């Protein structure tokens, strides 16, 4: 049985970040900085409450007679209580013989063009551990992008304004960055398991390292750019945030309304139409929060019964990173032209160059991951390098055709076909392991 390392990581980040936020808020109170104290507590306690409710919702404890679990969650100690449950189940799993098991079927990665279907017995203890891992992973994503991301931005902004960094602030910024990167990593794993739910997915350690570096560079540079821009144009940053937020929040709904599909009713049997609407709104809220700081890897599709698109859209990925790079460049240029005296001893051109190179480095690690370390790269219809070469050929062909004054309608169609690749395997449907796969509702069960 797999050791629950992801549970330990989630609980450690949750407890450490909450404790650091409480300590830092007390120092702000002692210094008389009431506003910083309130915001620090808000970005700590709000995701903390959402995490408690997420764990309760996933395990359906609200409809069960478990007063101790409810009490621990009310005391904001739910993750610690759940962690103890996980280790009790893990330690007792080898001692007790499983009276009941379920059988799941998965396909192995193709070897020499052949893919075998294997059966696996899953006992009750292992099924409970899978549920706990999924619950903590969902909670980590919520904590990362609804708590840690604004917390990191706030503390870095305070550091820039005061031109001073304390030990407590440095500690919480480090924890917040780790929490965001870990949440983004969980999003990547979620996307892989959803798109290839027929297959037995095994992520290698080098793949985790590559994703960690990709997300670290991407998120760190994004937060620094937002903080620099906020420090000189406080009013305009509201417009930037609102445009980013509502673009990603409304996009899934606009696509849904344009499709003319009926309202999804099969998300959760216990939910009414109002409850389903609330869950979908929270899902799109979390989706917008993720995409404001990094690529979500999971694409919402409300008109889909599973609420998540299983196709790998390279075209959308390309558009996202090109747009985000242009946006970061524009924000840095505006900061350069309107910077104040607090940046007197900062070499602005060098800082801008470092941030843009850092963001490009993150994109480079992303390409390396998809080219060499993706666990399902054998199922891709084309690799990253092949898609890039096809894009260059289409671009050159388009340029030549324009020079010859010929119609470009077919060229645009070919260009889109070269950049948008559907990598889903065309295999027969098998029985997926239900408890091991996240759905869109699983991601936002709060």
UniProtKB/Swiss-Prot annotation:
Subunit structure comment from the entry: Heterodimer with Kell; disulfide-linked. Interacts with VPS13A.
Keywords attached to this entry: Amino-acid transport, Disulfide bond, Endoplasmic reticulum, Membrane, Phosphoprotein, Transmembrane, Transmembrane helix, Transport
A Pfam family recorded for this sequence: XK-related
Keyword Nuclease appears in the UniProt entry: no
GO biological process: amino acid transport; intracellular calcium ion homeostasis; intracellular magnesium ion homeostasis; myelination; regulation of axon diameter; regulation of cell size; skeletal muscle fiber development
Coiled-coil intervals, chain numbering: none
Extracellular side: 24-37, 90-140, 193-208, 257-277, 339-349
Function: Recruits the lipid transfer protein VPS13A from lipid droplets to the endoplasmic reticulum (ER) membrane.
Originating organism: Mus musculus
Protein name: Endoplasmic reticulum membrane adapter protein XK
Phosphoserine modification, residue list: 115
Signal sequence bounds: none
GO molecular function annotation: protein-macromolecule adaptor activity
Stated family: Belongs to the XK family.
Segments passing through the bilayer: 3-23, 38-58, 69-89, 141-161, 172-192, 209-229, 236-256, 278-298, 318-338, 350-370
Subcellular location: Endoplasmic reticulum membrane
Cytoplasmic compartment segments: 1-2, 59-68, 162-171, 230-235, 299-317, 371-446
Main location: endoplasmic reticulum
Bilayer topology annotation: Multi-pass membrane protein
Cellular component GO terms held in the UniProt record: endoplasmic reticulum membrane; plasma membrane
